[in-house]
Amino acid sequence: MGISRNRLVPGLVGLAASAAIVLPLGIGMPVSSATAEENAPVQTLNVDYGTTTGDFYGGSSGMLYGLGDEGSPTDAILDGARVQVTSQKPADGLQHPSADVLAVENQFFNNGGEELVVNLQDWYPDWSYNGGKRPGDTRSYKLDVDPNDAQYGTYTDNAPNDRWDFDEVLEVVMNKILANTSHPDNIVFMPFNEPDGGNWYASGDNASADIYKQFLTDWNDAYATIQKVWNQYKSGEKTNVNGVKPTADHALIAGPGDSVWRANRTKALLESSKAANTLPDVIVWHELGNGSLKNYRSHYNQYRSFEQELGITPRAINISEFGELRDMSVPGQLIQWMSMFESTKVQAQTAYWNYAGNLNDNMARANSANGGWWLYKWYGDLRGTQTVKVTSEHPDSVDNLQGVAAIDTKNRKATVLYGGANDATKIGANIPVTVHMTGLDQSVFGESVDVQVRENAYTGPDGVAATPRVVNVLSDQKLVNGTLDVTTTSIDRYAGYQLVVTPHQDVATSLDNAENGRSLQAIEAEDTTLSDGAKAYTKSDNTGSWGNFMFSGNGDVGNFKNGAKMTWNVDVPADGAYRLQLITAPAGFPGVNHVYVDGKSVGDLNVPAELALKEAAKWKYRGSAEIVLDGLTKGKHAITVEATDLDNESDKLLLYQVSRGDGTPVDQVTYPASDMRLDSGAVLAYDGNGTNGFANLNGGRADVFAHAWEAGYQNVTIAYNAAKGAHFVLSVNGQSAATVTAQSDGAQTSIVRVAFSEGINQLTLSGAAGVRVASVTTARASESDSKAIRFEAEDAQLSGGAKVQKDDASDASGKSFVAGLGNQFVTNESGKAGYGDQTRVEADANHVPTVAQNNKGTMTVTGVPAGAYNMVVRFSNDAFIGSHSYNPQVVDLGLQVREGDQEIARGSFRYTYTEKHFMNRSVTVTTHGGALTLGNWDEVGSRKAAVSWGVAPNVDSITFYPITDGNVIDSVSGVTVSGEGVSADGKASLKVGETLSLNASVTPDSVADKTVQWTSSDEQVATVDEHGVVKGVKAGTVTITATSVADSSRSGSVEVTVAEDSEQKPSGGDGDNNGEQTGKPDGNTGGQTSDSDAGADSGNNQKHMPLTGAAVAAVAGVAVLLAGAGLLLKRLRSRS
């Protein structure tokens, strides 16, 4: 079921490949649309799987300063997003206080990164560089000491030495990098950034200007210096601290780096550098404005024509900055850029509008996803595929439907990523989109296919986006001449969609709707009922303005001052618990909004602080606040959000179903094998053994990136097929959690209770061939949270500069926290009044901060037993160093854990906008039972972090969750019924009035719930009580069955013959035999074993496994294309 705005409305039904209308399973006929928008004409995206366009390039996942420090972002976030390329500053560069190439390189390359670009001019502290003027020869740099000597690269002013100053800078930064990097061959060096703008060589596109001629000369000189230093390390003349030598023929160099496409200047550079043998390896320019969505392809084609004209081998291209503030975090916007760049096979990096370390606003909080992150995750999943031709009805246009499509022949999977469907309102609400696919090869997909469509809604740059929901399903659809149409209604232009086609599977994918506890509804804040001063504001759709964030629905609610209210009259689809989410932004500080349901107070939304350091961000940089509403009943309810003195502005509200309210799991999400990221030999299997669509681990790995709203325990249920004794390993966020051993042959499940981090968790399954995974399901298990060991920071043993700080305006628990861990920055209140936290770190002109190093603060806790833990730190960080024209100069802070003198863990902790606002960040730690001391022992300049000032974040609390709780819980493989007098062939007898005691044994031993339910096939012949005691009633034969409560498909039984007192007992087995009988799942006896013991190749696994597509396939001859009838995301507009 898709999101509904305000109420569920049956909508358009999808069209099958044969163009026949088919009905969603279990849903009635569609009714008339409730609003005019829902009668919007269908928009079509044409995907030709018969025309491949090359190997998937993956370059559109690039970032400029996407990484802030090692661990910022986290591994799960970084690996999930599969960032292919990022540009960072040089070692010890001063342009920004974080994002040092040497600090981030190992984490980047360990998590799917392929290429690091270094902006060499970012050595300078000022923007524009050197005051915007080309340097001359006024300095002498110290170059005659080791590159890691503190004096190396320092300079003396007013000391000309007959050498261009920037040439010396290039030598300094190249030596600092090559003396320390572990990945020289994967680094690209860019000597100039925006030379056409404010950085030294501005001439517009006039390639004849004297200043541009100077640029051509300087390009050749810079090229020569970079190659000189490279060759010194390659030859061994100079050495690297890690013993790593460059192996490539030459250093990779990128340029020119212009701020826009400059045709004349670019052609002149190609001509000049070809003649001088200094051609760039990577051609670089920016595509920042929304006009690039229509003009980029012409720029690309013109550039390629220059290469052809000049006889130059095609160069790689990196669009080193793309997009506007309004594009970041918005799936329906980002996909438009991705489609252009992937189709032309170039790298492209999102622009750096705000701060480093959050993937350019494409993640949320410390470790959570926003809508942008999920799109990057989907895009990263396409590695190893081939792209195919995609044609939009709106080619080369701004803000319209676009997509990327690929075919994975090894895994027999076709994927389409799309979004951006728009109309004259510039909102694009409720537009039906048909993905028209042709060329689907029957040799790959067979005669019939399954389709899944997932929806990824916009939640703001810092608003949490949960796992995208399945909103459209097609099962066992016959292909007609390789053609298939799938129609899904798009919620709005901001949303993104993932469509996956596979051969028909034995893994059924269900719609995420009220029936399985996964419904979702949404409403624009401005469409709620406003009262007591709250006001709706109409906003621009942001076209043509790079400096504005996106406003969902082109509006929001402000003037939300004390007592103001917005009320959502919502039709709840089913009884249960629901999570209300408010997409909102205060002015830089945290606070609360009160929440009422039908006039009754139900608690507060804890609204987090958000970025407010500049006009473009204040009240516009939206995050999210959540509260669970327990016990909502089906039907209409009024949910009211009431303002306090926080004065936050709000964009939209969402209502997520948490559970069905009938004891079903909380926050349950299923990830089928076809949605997993397979690597190192793991592959989707289609061999006809009842495991079609399962992931055969095959010695490789299958990764799931699972969302959790909060830190704590989750049940991870793995459904799989394997031979008895086969095993595989479950790891969570890089930590081994459990080795799972198959307890029987065939289909089964195992459950591991694991401590999750708040946000994204990387679950990895690794095992041998023959272990075939159908799905992984996660569900909250909060009852185990009591196993965690929690410390309030102020209760720890403090020393040095550590001190307890009380702040009633903070969102720290108890309004107290510990500050002063590690070194301490010297700060003052110098920020602009009214724009968030005014605290600034004192720093010199080079952004070097003043640090107190003589009183390192620590906090020590005891009582944590030896073991592996997910350590959750609730922290704050308001460190802000220096100034910049548009980038907040924030930094990550480091926290380390020591046991005795041994460091056992460390982490980077992001900027939280103010010391008053606390976030959660997890660090994996293994202890030996001793006292644990937390602080920061890094020495200034140690390069253990991008900014190694030895300063730690403020700490509110620390919670240690053991990685797992309990042993692996396996599924029931069989039920055996036995008892005195039961024969080997499962028969027993007794007389009327007599009793017989039966026992039921549930296997394997690792089953958690071994209770059974006893039943009699005819209680007029014999009854059985809850303890298995059978009593004869009258003569006859009856079957007594014990059914597993944990798995009702598993049972065992015996046949009991009841005789009158005068009758002779029938022969059939020795009464002293005490034989046992294992019943089949259908209750049959006769000495046959249950299906779980029949072996993986018995052919019966599909019949009895609960995760097959049998139920859907049984709808004879009907292909179900779920594209409507209340199952799609609807937006009910209340204004024109």
UniProtKB/Swiss-Prot annotation:
Pfam families named among the record's database cross-references: Big_2
Lineage, broadest ranks: Bacteria, Bacillati, Actinomycetota, Actinomycetes, Bifidobacteriales
Active-site residues annotated for this sequence: E194, E321
SMART domains with a match to the protein in the record: BID_2
Name of the protein in its database record: 3-O-alpha-D-galactosyl-alpha-L-arabinofuranosidase
Assigned EC number: 3.2.1.215
Protein role: Hydrolase involved in the degradation of the gum arabic arabinogalactan protein (AGP). Catalyzes the release of 3-O-alpha-D-galactopyranosyl-L-arabinose (alpha-D-Galp-(1->3)-L-Ara) from gum arabic AGP. Can also release 3-O-beta-L-arabinopyranosyl-L-arabinose (beta-L-Arap-(1->3)-L-Ara) from gum arabic AGP and larch AGP, but the alpha-D-Galp-(1->3)-L-Ara release activity is 594-fold higher than the beta-L-Arap-(1->3)-L-Ara release activity. Exhibits no reactivity toward p-nitrophenyl (pNP)-alpha-Araf or any other tested pNP substrate.
Marked site: Important for substrate specificity: N119
One function term, GO molecular function aspect: carbohydrate binding
Organism per entry: Bifidobacterium longum subsp. longum
Family matches, as InterPro entries: Big_2 (IPR003343), CBM6 (IPR005084), Galactose-bd-like_sf (IPR008979), Glycoside_hydrolase_SF (IPR017853), Invasin/intimin_cell_adhesion (IPR008964)
Regions crossing the membrane: 1109-1129
Family as reported in the entry's similarity comment: Belongs to the glycosyl hydrolase 39 family.
